[in-house]
Swiss-Prot record:
SUPFAM superfamilies to which the protein is assigned, alphabetical: Thioredoxin-like
Annotated GO biological process: circadian rhythm
Similarity comment: family membership: Belongs to the KaiB family.
Organism: Prochlorococcus marinus (strain SARG / CCMP1375 / SS120)
Protein name: Circadian clock oscillator protein KaiB
Pfam family, one: KaiB
């Protein structure tokens, strides 16, 4: 079994707004449940550190960025939906085994010929 990856995440918030606090609460629950011991989270308040937001091109809050492992992924806005957060950061699919992913028929849900006549 290979060692688990380490995840580096940055959460950009604007003060202690309800959206910011909800994002932080949801994210901590996800990390403690699914990524315990293999993550580092940096919370950046863009009101206190506007230069960091500018450097990282953050235009809206809350924004969650997965820095490592590559590729960098961002999810902006409501972070209260656990599954949406995991899918948006491309973390959910890493947990699935190959047999889980390919359990359906090749022509089932994901057809590359969709929309062709």
């Amino acid at each position: 079994m290979s060692p688990r990856k380490t995840y580096i995440l940055k959460l950009y918030v604007a003060g202690n707004t309800p959206n910011s606090m909800r994002a932080l609460t949801t994210l901590r629950e996800i990390l403690q449940t699914d990524f315990k011991g293999v993550y580092a989270l940096k919370v950046i308040d863009v009101l206190k550190n506007p230069q960091l937001a500018e450097e990282d091109k953050i235009l809206a809050t809350p924004t969650l960025a997965k820095i490592l492992p590559p590729p960098v992924r961002r999810i902006i806005g409501d972070l209260s939906d656990r599954e949406r957060v995991l899918i948006g950061l491309d973390l959910l699919f890493e947990e699935l085994s190959e047999s889980d992913f390919f359990s359906g028929s090749p022509d089932s849900e994901f057809s590359s010929d969709e929309g062709k006549s």
